Amino acid sequence: MPKYKEVYQKEVIPALMKEMSYSSVMQVPRIEKITLNMGVGEALGDKKQIEAAAADLEAITGQKVVVTKARKSVAGFKIRQGFPIGCKVTLRGDRMWEFFERLVDVAIPRVRDFRGLNQKSFDGRGNYSMGVKEQIIFPEIDYDKIDKVRGMDITITTSANTDDEGRALLNAFSFPFRK
């Protein structure tokens, strides 16, 4: 069983039940999924860019990547409908917990000039989104083998109803928010 899943069941649930005064264990917010998205605008001129980005995401998550395609044509960006323009992965279950553990304990501390994550990046429904400027903060990525430094979006979807509940959940895992 992943470490953070055990921490959630043994420490976080009782702490949040007391803090938020829930009447049932099922009311306690939980992390439902983590979505990683990498937009690859350069893929228009070079198809290998998408493959390299997908390989990076696969190495980070250990799961097959879905290539996202343009929904409609935009002449200003020289995009045609159906063009591959990015890739994404949705993690659930044990893979999600293992990734969350690596994100909090290993990857985020490796960010250069890190001062904490913005607390205002909640969406109003308890979900947290953050951006990463370079994929090399993850230990699975070999710095010598990458062709280009790419960023990605990471969204942590929770079952929380409000931002305060979502913030309390992530704080219980000692998520590195800016003070």
UniProtKB/Swiss-Prot annotation:
Name of the protein described by the UniProt record: Large ribosomal subunit protein uL5
Lineage, highest ranks first: Bacteria, Pseudomonadati, Pseudomonadota, Gammaproteobacteria, Oceanospirillales
Keywords: Ribonucleoprotein, Ribosomal protein, RNA-binding, rRNA-binding, tRNA-binding
One record GO biological process: translation
Function noted in UniProt: This is one of the proteins that bind and probably mediate the attachment of the 5S RNA into the large ribosomal subunit, where it forms part of the central protuberance. In the 70S ribosome it contacts protein S13 of the 30S subunit (bridge B1b), connecting the 2 subunits; this bridge is implicated in subunit movement. Contacts the P site tRNA; the 5S rRNA and some of its associated proteins might help stabilize positioning of ribosome-bound tRNAs.
Any Pfam family the entry gives: Ribosomal_L5
Cellular component GO terms, alphabetical: ribonucleoprotein complex; ribosome
Matches recorded under InterPro entries: Ribosomal_uL5, Ribosomal_uL5_bac-type, Ribosomal_uL5_C, Ribosomal_uL5_CS, Ribosomal_uL5_dom_sf, Ribosomal_uL5_N
Molecular-function annotations in GO: rRNA binding; structural constituent of ribosome; tRNA binding
Family from the record: Belongs to the universal ribosomal protein uL5 family.
Assembly notes: Part of the 50S ribosomal subunit; part of the 5S rRNA/L5/L18/L25 subcomplex. Contacts the 5S rRNA and the P site tRNA. Forms a bridge to the 30S subunit in the 70S ribosome.
Keyword Cell wall biogenesis/degradation: no
